[in-house]
A protein has these predicted regions:
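Short, intrinsically disordered, charge-balanced linker/junction segments flanking boundaries
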Residues: 1, 169-171
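Gly/Thr-rich phosphate-binding beta-strand-loop-beta motif of the actin/hexokinase/Hsp70
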Residues: 1-15
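Mg2+-dependent endonuclease catalytic cores in nucleic-acid-processing enzymes, primarily RNase H-like
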Residues: 11, 18-142, 159-165, 172
């Protein structure tokens, strides 16, 4: 998930075919409001360094990066400095994405690593706006949601490959 004043978060997951699950690997987090803003090219360099470290640590190649579709400048910078990785603008249907992530948690098909501290923190805070619920709508509160959004982008982006980890009736 990308932000200038709001946090920029990279959530890394691997596909564990033997357990039919997404396995959390690590996280990178920077809040522009607290730590100073960075340019898209600086974030692209941070992402490259993060992916290089993951590849070395896990002896696996990073294949895909899903980036907030509103971050066109970052997408272009990442494509420029990481041409070997498929950079995909994230699917951003919030309601469907939340439903898919919930299914993965319900069926224990997503495993979080203790290094994913912001994701762990945010999952306990992620909520719908009580006022919107009173009006018969479910609108997500857009606070404390950056790591969770990054995870939602991943689940939706990989859905065609990972939906098979769920019971047939829950694959939609």
């Amino acid at each position: 998930d990308y932000g200038q004043k709001n946090p920029t978060v990279f959530e890394a997951f691997g596909v564990d075919y033997s357990r039919q699950a997404l396995r959390g690997l690590d996280e990178w987090y920077h809040c522009g409001r607290d730590e100073g803003q960075k340019s898209p090219s600086e974030y692209a360099k941070e992402l490259k360094d993060f992916c290089d470290r993951l590849e070395k640590e896990y002896d696996r190649v990073v294949s895909w990066v899903f980036i907030d579709p509103s971050a066109a400048g970052l997408i272009e910078e990442v494509r420029r400095i990481m041409p070997h990785i498929e950079v995909i603008p994230a699917f951003n249907d919030v309601k469907l994405g939340i439903s898919r992530v919930q299914k993965f948690f319900s069926f224990r098909r997503i495993l979080i690593n203790r290094n994913q501290k912001q994701l762990i923190r945010e999952l306990g805070l992620y909520q719908y706006d009580p006022e919107s619920i009173k009006k018969g709508k479910e609108e997500v509160l857009k606070v404390n949601d950056h790591a969770a959004d990054a995870t939602r982008y991943l689940v939706c982006g990989m859905w065609g490959l990972i939906a098979v980890f769920l019971p047939v009736s829950d694959r939609e």
